[in-house]
UniProtKB/Swiss-Prot annotation:
The Asp-Asp-Xaa-Xaa-Asp/Glu (DDXXD/E) motif is important for the catalytic activity, presumably through binding to Mg(2+). It catalyses: (2E,6E)-farnesyl diphosphate = alpha-humulene + diphosphate. Keywords: Lyase, Magnesium, Metal-binding. Binds 3 Mg(2+) or Mn(2+) ions per subunit. Pathway: Sesquiterpene biosynthesis; Terpene metabolism; oleoresin biosynthesis. Its cofactor is Mg(2+); Mn(2+). The gene is TPS-Hum. This is Alpha-humulene synthase. Terpene synthase (TPS) involved in the biosynthesis of sesquiterpene natural products included in conifer oleoresin secretions and volatile emissions; these compounds contribute to biotic and abiotic stress defense against herbivores and pathogens. Catalyzes the conversion of (2E,6E)-farnesyl diphosphate (FPP) to (1E,4E,8E)-alpha-humulene. Belongs to the terpene synthase family. Tpsa subfamily. A motif (DDXXD motif) lies at residues 325-329. Mg(2+) 1 binds at residues 325, 329.
């Protein structure tokens, strides 16, 4: 294929991104047996059996508040709670909420005078995640006069209570001081336990595995499929837990559910791999080849089988976004980028006819994908939404052009000027639009407006994604000549600030933004929950991928292991 011969004389910057770390032939060879009808029939049978078992277990008079909450937590950790939402609410959470008061809840009956930290923390977390209105002030009942948290239990039960408190503290809203205190206290306490230097020794190994997971992957930077696979492994090694017949059946169901979903996800990544491999752009070596990593990001956001069109769209959009990012940041000249931007403004591909072939291929890749997805949206929503989609794409590329102009002139804008543009260039404007319109629900225009900019949840998701990315990448980008980052802009506005101070300030903004995003996600409004959950999980998924660095630009060992564990590695299931 023709490469860049006609533009070889033009000096071009390069980002020196590494190549594709995945063998496309390996991806295309994946073959899971769990797509067979017999496994779906077995899953449906297990779900129905489990519904009866759960109701009987949770409504048993000998198993009151704490047992109900433990069951809910187990189902959620294993990623199978979506099958039992009715049972969870009617047999567990409605009852727990009726027993809830400002003092907390006890282990036994609803009027128990002895309040329990484990039960209260489990209840706070579960009720908030299911949008019950409960105050974090209940945790103040478990603080001494010095603000330290206490637990009257000993041994593993004490560690379990502190673990529950840590996990509850992550579901925090702005201004909740007690939640911040709980998080700081429990992280320090559990870190000591894990190191063997705490006040509890000889801790159960399975419990230590749960502690390790909670410390390494807090709720706001975890991913549902990763959590499910991890807890299948944790519970599967806990022989005392497996002594219960209901736990054995729960684990069997979780394994089968994960395997069936993995089969679906494998077929989808094969679809994306063929789409990428068959495109002309796959033959060019100056654009990042991250279709596997970007599809994996989609799985971290939304994994349920019914949302396959949204996952496919998400992977295609973000892959196109990576190509545009490389084109605008490093490969294209400013004159070429102005021509491309004008072509997108007019939605007229003929305007790029005189550009070098390699750039035309990138533009054709963009237009073909954008037009293909627009057709899918029209079919799904039953009305023409191409004007909205085009306008959103146009805003997106215009923000890239602004950044390219800053690079060309070596201009560092003010912090506020940078943020205004960066919210758009984060890509959330388009990443959160098309997949959302393909979720399966018909969304009225007013609902779309509530979700998208200038809505609060959209603005916060744009901001957090930009902050996460810039905190990780600003040094690498500076080396490539991209000097306008949130860190550099802050230091320009605050010339006396050190790099450490600037990073701490920006991390503080990120922390507050994540708490505000929690609130926007949890609060009750007219936006369908699946839409808000998708928006929220885009941020969670990116934090998960950026846990060990920029997991998209640099597909390091940790990210590759994560992808392998979720998309490739099968769980052994006994027939």
């Amino acid at each position: 294929m023709a490469q860049i011969s006609e533009s070889a004389a033009i000096p071009r910057r390069t980002a020196n991104h590494h190549g594709n770390v995945w063998d496309d032939d390996l991806i295309l060879s994946l073959d899971s047996p769990y797509g067979a009808p017999a496994y779906y029939e077995r899953l449906a049978k297990l779900i129905e059996e489990m519904k009866h078992l759960l109701l009987r277990e949770m409504e048993d008079s000998n198993h009151d508040l704490i047992r109900r909450l433990q069951i809910v937590d187990t189902l959620e950790c294993l990623g199978i709670d979506r099958h039992f939402q009715h049972e969870i609410k009617t047999a567990a959470l409605h009852y727990v909420y009726r027993c809830w008061n400002e003092k907390g809840i006890g282990m036994g009956s609803s009027d128990s005078g002895s309040k329990d930290l484990d039960a209260t923390a489990l209840g706070l977390r579960a009720l908030r995640l299911h949008r019950y209105n409960v105050s974090s002030g209940v945790l103040e009942n478990f603080q001494d006069e010095n603000g330290k948290f206490f637990c009257n239990l000993t041994g593993d039960k004490r560690v379990r209570s502190m673990l529950s408190l840590l996990r509850a503290s992550e579901i925090s809203f702005p201004g909740e001081k007690v939640m911040q205190e709980a998080k700081a206290f429990t992280r320090e306490y559990l870190t000591q336990v894990l190191a063997g230097s705490g006040d509890v020794t000889d801790v159960d190994q399975s419990l230590l595995r749960e502690v390790k997971y909670a410390l390494e992957f807090p709720w706001y930077c975890s991913a549902p499929r990763w959590e499910a696979k991890s807890f299948i492994e944790i519970y599967g090694q806990n022989q005392s837990w497996l002594k219960s017949n209901i736990n054995q059946e729960v684990l069997e169901l979780a394994k089968l559910d994960f395997s069936i979903l993995q089969c679906i996800h494998q077929k989808e990544i094969q679809c994306i791999t063929r789409w990428w491999r068959d495109s002309e752009i796959a033959q060019l070596n100056f654009y990042r080849r991250r279709h596997v990593e970007l599809y994996f990001w989609a799985v971290t956001c939304i994994f349920e089988p019914e949302f396959s069109p949204s996952r496919i769209a998400f992977a295609k959009i973000t892959t196109v976004g990576a190509v545009l990012d490389d084109l605008y940041d490093t490969h294209g000249t400013l004159d070429e980028l102005k021509t491309i931007t004008e072509a997108v403004r007019r939605w007229d591909l003929s305007l790029i006819d005189d550009l070098p072939n390699n750039i035309k291929i990138a533009c054709q890749f963009f237009f073909n994908t954008a037009n293909e997805l627009a057709v899918e949206v029209v079919k799904k929503q039953g009305r023409d939404m191409t004007a909205l989609l085009k306008a959103t794409w146009q805003r997106y590329v215009e923000s890239y052009l602004q950044e390219a102009e800053w690079i060309e002139t070596r201009h560092v804008p003010s912090f506020n000027e940078y943020i205004k543009n960066a919210l758009v260039s984060s890509g959330m404007c388009i990443v959160n639009l098309i997949p959302l319109l393909l979720l399966g629900q018909l969304l009225a225009n007013n609902i779309v407006e509530q979700i998208l900019s200038p809505s609060k949840i959209q603005e916060l998701s744009e901001l957090t994604i930009r902050l996460i990315d810039d905190i990780r990448d600003f040094e690498d980008e500076k080396e490539r000549g991209e000097i306008a980052s949130i860190v550099e802009c802050y230091m320009k506005d605050n010339p006396d600030s050190t790099l450490e101070n600037a990073l701490n300030h920006i991390k503080g903004i990120l922390h507050v933004s994540l708490e505000e995003l929690n609130w926007e996600f949890m609060k009750d409004d007219s936006v369908p929950l699946c839409c808000k959950k998708f928006t929220f999980n885009i941020v969670r998924g990116l934090q998960f991928l950026y846990k060990y660095g920029d997991g998209i630009s640099i597909s390091n060992k940790e990210v590759k292991d994560q992808i392998f564990k979720i998309l490739v590695d099968q769980i052994p299931i006994e027939d």
